[in-house]
C-alpha cells in the first residue's frame, strides 16, 4: 500500500494504527481580473504571507498565506487573508489593491513535521518517504508526503523504487525517462495529450484574433474568456470532457468576471446535447452538475464581496 494522500496522509496512516505528524497548512490566494504583469514577481524577503505575484492566463494571482488548519476537509477563507493579499500586492505592484478581485480560494499543503515548531513556514517543503516496516513494524505500507508540485515526479520515482525493492523486484520507475507533452499538446510521436492549441490561448487578444479570423462572434459562449461554441464542443469531443468542470479546465469556462453567471447555463445545454446522444446524462444529472459548478464558483466569490466588489 502506497499512502500518497497529501494532507490526508495522517488520516490514512491512522486507519492502519500508524501515527504521522502532519501539519496541514492552508494557503489562500486571490485572482484579479487583469494580467498586469507578464512575468512572476517575487519579493526577496524572509518567507511570509503574500510574497509572490503570478500571471496566469488572463488574470494575475497573488499569494499566499500559511495558516495551520486542524482538518484539511474543513476550513474557511478569512477576510483578513484577502485584505493581507491586497496590502502585500500593493507593495509588489502599486495600484494592485484597486484592481477588481475575481475570487479567492485556498489549498492545503501536506506539511510533515518531525520536530516541534509553532510556525508552519519553519517546516521543510522537502518530500518525505516513510517505510513503515522499518519505522513502525508495519510491513507492506509506504507513505510519500510533503513536497511540492515541482517535485511530484521525483516523489513518484522514489516511492515506486522503494515499493519494487520491498517486493523484491528489480524494475525501476521510468517517470524520469518519459516525455512530457510539448506546449502544443503533442509528444515527439505526434500524439495529442491535450486539446489542440486553438483552445490554449493565454491572452484574450489571442482568442479575439482567432474568433475574428474565423468569423465566430455569433457563437460566443463565455464572453469573459471569449470561449466559443466550437471551443466547448472541442473540449467535449476531443478533450473528452464529461463535466462542466472538465470544460472549465480546458477553455477557462466561468473563470472570468461573471464567474459562470451567464456562460455556464449555455455550456450546460451544449454538454447535455452531446452527452444525451450517447445516453450518458439525463436532464436531472445536468441540472445537478450545473448547480454544483455554480456553487463552487460562488464559494470563491463570497470572500471578496465587499465595497466596490458588490
Walk through the language-model features, giving the residues of each.
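Short hydrophobic core segments
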Residues: 1-8, 155
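Low-complexity, small/polar and acidic-rich linker and loop segments
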Residues: 281-310
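Intrinsic disorder/low-complexity detector
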Residues: 5, 186, 195, 280-283
